């Protein structure tokens, strides 16, 4: 876990991972559909991407799910304690000076975007956290890393009109996935004009 950040209920996936990126992917799909609408006899024109509205949509999706999760936790009588926890024994966690004991303790600390030594995260170079909150569509983007998060951002930005290049050190995109899936994704991305 990043030492300076405490997540809200729902953690990385809900607030700065899976869910917000899927909302961006949906907006990107809508942009692609509008470009291809003439194939279906629907005449429409894409006049651009309003990132303020896209981000409002993303935040609305996250907000609704967060509210639903809070309601679910409450309805199931789950005790939710906000704060930094510390394992003080095999079955006891201390948070804010209070100790909580259970038969089993699950350590689910979430994740955070990493940087590389010597790189300044300054806006021009950014982590996925900053990329998730961009208020503009970049003209050109280099995505360093062809894992799941990298290929999702590459797809979104290409759909929004950016020139995109993915740099992956391993032989294939999404290297943890089946090679046939990886090859199919690479073909699809090349066809869309994403450079690998």
Question: Each PLM stretch: what is its role?
Answer:
Residues 143, 152, 165-166:
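Structured core elements
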Residues 1, 163-164:
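Short beta-strand element of Class I
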């Amino acid at each position: 876990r990043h030492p300076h950040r405490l997540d809200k209920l729902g953690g990385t996936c809900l607030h700065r991972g899976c869910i917000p990126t899927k909302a961006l992917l949906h907006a990107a799909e809508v942009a692609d559909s509008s470009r291809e609408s003439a194939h279906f006899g629907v005449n429409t024109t894409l006049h651009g991407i309003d990132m303020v509205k896209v981000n409002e949509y993303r935040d609305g999706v996250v907000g609704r799910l967060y509210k639903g999760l809070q309601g679910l936790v409450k309805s199931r009588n789950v005790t939710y304690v906000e704060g930094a926890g510390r394992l003080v024994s095999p079955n006891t966690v201390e948070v804010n000076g209070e100790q909580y004991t259970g038969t089993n303790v699950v350590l689910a600390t979430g994740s955070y975007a990493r940087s590389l030594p010597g790189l300044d995260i300054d806006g021009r170079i950014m982590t996925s956290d900053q990329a998730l909150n961009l208020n503009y569509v970049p003209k050109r983007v280099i995505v360093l890393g062809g894992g799941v998060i990298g290929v999702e951002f590459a797809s979104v930005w290409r759909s929004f009109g950016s020139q995109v290049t993915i740099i992956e050190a391993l032989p294939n995109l999404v290297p943890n996935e089946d090679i046939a899936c990886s090859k199919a994704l690479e073909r699809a991305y090349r066809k869309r004009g994403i450079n690998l």
